[in-house]
Amino acid sequence: MKALLDLFKQVSQDEQFDAIKIGIASPEKIRSWSYGEVRKPETINYRTFKPERDGLFCSKIFGPIKDYECLCGKYKRLKHRGVICEKCGVEVTVAKVRRERMGHIELASPVAHIWFLKSLPSRLGMVLDMTLRDIERVLYFEAWCVIEPGMTPLKRGQIMSDDDFLAKTEEYGDDFRALMGAEAVRELLRTIDIDREVETLRGELKATSSEAKIKKISKRLKVLEGFQKSGIKAEWMVMEVLPVLPPDLRPLVPLDGGRFATSDLNDLYRRVINRNNRLKRLLELKAPEIILRNEKRMLQEAVDSLLDNGRRGKAMTGANKRQLKSLADMIKGKSGRFRQNLLGKRVDYSGRSVIVVGPQLKLHQCGLPKLMALELFKPFIFNRLEMMGLATTIKAAKKLVESQEPVVWDILEEVIREHPVMLNRAPTLHRLGIQAFEPVLIEGKAIQLHPLVCAAFNADFDGDQMAVHVPLSLEAQLEARTLMLASNNVLFPANGEPSIVPSQDIVLGLYYTTRERINGKGEGIFFTDVAEVQRAYDNGEVELQSRITVRLTEYERDDNGEFQPVLRRHETTVGRALLSEILPKGLPFTVLNKALKKKEISRLINQSFRRCGLRDTVIFADKLMQSGFRLATRGGISIAMGDMLIPKAKEGILAEASREVKEIDKQYSSGLVTSQERYNNVVDIWGKASDKVGKAMMEQLATEPVVNRHGEEVRQESFNSIYMMADSGARGSAAQIRQLAGMRGLMAKPDGSIIETPITANFREGLNVLQYFISTHGARKGLADTALKTANSGYLTRRLVDVTQDLVITEDDCGTTQGYAMKALVEGGEVIEPLRDRILGRVAAIDVVDPDTQETAIAAGTLLDEDLVDLIDRIGVDEVKVRTPLTCETRHGLCAHCYGRDLGRGSHVNVGEAVGVIAAQSIGEPGTQLTMRTFHIGGAASRSALASAVETKSTGKVGFASTMRYVTNAKGERVAISRSGELAIFDDNGRERERHKIPYGATVLVGDGEAVKAGTRLATWDPLTRPIVSEYGGAVRFENIEEGVTVAKQLDEITGLSTLVVITPKTRSGKTVTRPQIKLVNENGEDVKIAGTDHSVNISFPVGALITVRDGQQVAVGEVLARIPQESQKTRDITGGLPRVAELFEARSPKDAGMLADVTGTVSFGKDTKGKQRLVITDLEGVSHEFLIPKEKQVLVHDGQVVNKGEMIVDGPADPHDILRLQGIEKLATYIVDEVQDVYRLQGVKINDKHIEVIVRQMLRRVNIVDAGDTEFIPGEQVERSELLNENDRVTAEGKRPATYDNVLLGITKASLSTDSFISAASFQETTRVLTEAAIMGKRDDLRGLKENVIVGRLIPAGTGLAYHMARKDKEALEAAEREAARQLANPFEDAPVTVDADAPQSDAGQEGSAE
């Protein structure tokens, strides 16, 4: 009977668990796992191939080799199950146990575990409070360590060399005890009193105030508390018993030719056993100490390399000089256990093939080759054959299928019907990279794919391959059908735009059809309906592009929401009228009544989705595609040399540019400009010329002359093929056409600097050798970049996914009223992103109030859809406070309200949606489109910086922002002297229309409150130099301006003119050289003071400034004292593209970051120290704060200026950590979102803000404890925000003091590694370190994230899995409650206290359920 039960036990090994705990195994634990001791290094007998007894593959320890058969063959078959053979000692059972039974090795001398020794910071060192160097000396038998000092003056843990030891032994005899090796360390660990240590440390922590000490103590405290809480004993870090891995996990495989392939682990184990046995023998023989010492050291080294080869000393190598793979190597890295086998497995029931286009398919179908389908659906076919009685056994069914009988094909058709398959194209960069389709059987061997899903897969038909997977279980089929079917995924999750937008041929066909031609055949005819138009077109009476008038039926919804037909007359073209047939009900004809370019078609599909729903849109898109292909073919648009029209004006433009360049060269040789300015100007001239040629070419291409009905010549949009391809957005761009028919223009060298001689030819004219050579630079750099980019972009995506993988929508509403105020994004006076785009799909945090009537237009908590955003636009609200993931108060996960709309579905987000992963994919997916390079200012990048004036785009009133300060100079011009001055233009209602930054030193041409018309110049400035402007009048007095010390006379060799240039001061010994500066003196010879203070005006010059005034010269307010040439203002590299995004998400402080004021107060300068200047801010209480700033930095403030907290005081890029510290989370989020968006916008990639916000939320998930209050935390410790809030709630409920904390910004790599889940962190990076730390702390992983659950093989807690886990937990809680109730019913007369007691755990469980 027992055997029967055992049989059942073996089958159902389906344990449910909710958490995984990791710890350090005690020797007893290791022995309890073991089925016997491995005593011999032998593996298998080379003649019989049977395992040696007591060896590494011993059957007695690890189990039989064949199922139910002992080694000597005495017992065979099932009936002897469980018998232990008396001859060979092998238990008769399944051979599978060789994968799970472990053995052990009793070590003759204890051995320290290398992970706890060498993984930095060394855990052994922390517990013992010794340095790693000292512990190593003891462990590897180079020094003695005092264990018990007894009555001697020695200290416990003191290290002594051999000579010292002998001397001390002579002195004290055996009053003290000292040991060497792992025994010493184990003794020290065993005798340490952890509770007392923790108490002393806590006391020291309260008493000390030095930063370094606090850091050191709290680190050690953390480790010791880990031991204390987890109940792990410190001495277990030193091993007495070594577990042996089950043999089938380190197999020995016979190869043909009598050789064996073996796992490296066997070698490593062999070494350990050999050394251990030798040591045992030496101990029995009472060998001399020195031999034993050597043997013990070798044993320690052997165990080290088994656990982590190469971690210490030289790595052990096999016969072929290759490093052996140790246990640690098995789990870490890309090919380790985590990433190779647990997170990415190869899948059964899958196939791959080349894809070809299948334009006849519906959107939800794909063509599957018959042979592939036959192979993939085999089990289903077998089942069907048996059910129909065509085959009696599986074997027979197999035969039928293999001979491909006709009946098999019919059955295949049946089996495949309504059974979706999943198609995947690698690289799968976002969730649209895997979609489900209904298979349609086809001949041939290639998979057919619908053209419209190519955009989502990023596929083309130039040899791409795709993989097919079959969802087997009913649930899987259901999910594939409802969630993954291609026709259910028509929006990009990144931005909510349609993904099934036609491209290329389709666009060209639709565009050609919907263009209008002046005086086409049949122009001006009136038609009754579309059918009549069709007849006329078929008979050749009208042309496709002719303008006609036709009566069309449109459908509009009445009050009941029913469609009512409405007849209207439209002036349109033949093509558009014919297209109107496929328009879904509910869309007006006006959406089609224009030339359909790619953007228009995208908008059309978007409108259709919002108004007509998913089904109609999919059908509409399919029909659009069919029409597009058909019409493109009928249009017969081709491409020819003659289409590339070279502009007539080209020669003139080039001649003019050459003349200007000669002029600049002349100025340079006469010394009016510097060489850098000459280069900048030349590049600028050619850039402008290139643009002019391009413009002339486009103008010539874009229109053509034509005679209209009245015989007049007019110009119409051209029907030139190349122009139509570019204009429709089908293929190519103006820039590419410019290279074909205009001029190629300026080329860059590989380092990014621009070659100043442009390529004046185009591809139609052909390039000469020099021009061709110049252009190869760019092409090769492009190829190299692409290869780098792909790897970098993939790594960025991996880090992003890792940091956000546990973020899931877990509840509907967290109930917060927090949120961020959203405004339209304005840059350089242009609205880059209107307010409607930024708030679409968000939830209003507070009521939106109509500014005119002051009534609530939209209540708080409403999801803002298209109609509501239009309403907000109409009533003229310019700021809306919306909920955001950053202010969500859900502890684990996010709430649906703070997230808003699920962009991939177009509706409110569901609970269980894995929004973290979606955000990571949305940001990572376009990564390959971003550039890799860092720009140098100069060349192309500086061309964008060469704006020299700003004009208003709208009519209104000028308003100066509060930051705007200016002085009026002698000519009556206003000169801006503020660093961050801004001008705004307000319309009649006082709403801000645009806003412009005015740089320092610009001439402002309008006054505050002045009315201006659109196109008015607001300000001008010199783009190539930056002036230093005087704010006061007076006579100049030079200070520290000594030639050869602080300034140099710069003689231009060519011109012979000299200027004073500020240089880095040469320090003479003993003399401190201060900065060159000037003071202003009034008529009486006194210093001019800053208004309202007694500070005198002093203006200091940065290095590289050209001083334009002379000593003693009278200057007026607003006059230029010096100019800083733009290039000497340190050409800062602008990091662009992918590296910039990575930099932002890794929260790196920029190299020469700008400085923000820590406090609000008045600026003054203290005494300069070597190479640094001292800047002092005195706050409102009179406390002064000092900052040391390197001399070469540009200080943006002057003596006596008042600055606000968080304002820039030293020029340079902002440091995100400073922004968080001084301006708070909201400012930081805005900064990161805007900066990331800038990079993507430059490439024309749209990503919704909330994806970036989700990542920022994860970067802010840890906090730094400032004051622990009455909580269990240690000051300076970093903890998970949710953990801290829970603990604070608990403490506050008990009426104690909660902990106070600072926000911490972690980079995505750091944040992933600091997650609470050790499984997730270990599978990401630094596996060894993560596991070591987790084991000491006895960490418990609650399997909250997706990654942990994938690794342990459970359903992920997202989507359908979340519901499954929640239901399971509720059920368990319910069952526990029922058991409890039943128990109480069984013995109702127990005394009261017990029942109360029994109630407690149940309520506890209830709470746990709710907390989840």
Curated annotation (Swiss-Prot):
Q: Where, if anywhere, are coiled coils annotated?
A: none
Q: Which GO terms describe its biological process?
A: DNA-templated transcription
Tell me the cofactor note: Binds 1 Mg(2+) ion per subunit.
Q: Which GO terms describe its molecular function?
A: DNA binding; DNA-directed RNA polymerase activity; magnesium ion binding; zinc ion binding
Q: What is its EC number?
A: 2.7.7.6
Gene3D superfamilies from the UniProt entry: 1.10.132.30, 1.10.150.390, 1.10.1790.20, 1.10.40.90, 2.40.40.20, 2.40.50.100, RNA polymerase II, clamp domain, RNA polymerase Rpb1, domain 3
Which key words tag this protein in UniProt?
Answer: DNA-directed RNA polymerase, Magnesium, Metal-binding, Nucleotidyltransferase, Transcription, Transferase, Zinc
GO CC terms on record? DNA-directed RNA polymerase complex
What does the subunit section of this Swiss-Prot or TrEMBL entry state?
The RNAP catalytic core consists of 2 alpha, 1 beta, 1 beta' and 1 omega subunit. When a sigma factor is associated with the core the holoenzyme is formed, which can initiate transcription.
Query: This protein is called what?
Result: DNA-directed RNA polymerase subunit beta'
Species source reads Bordetella petrii (strain ATCC BAA-461 / DSM 12804 / CCUG 43448)
Q: Which gene encodes it?
A: rpoC
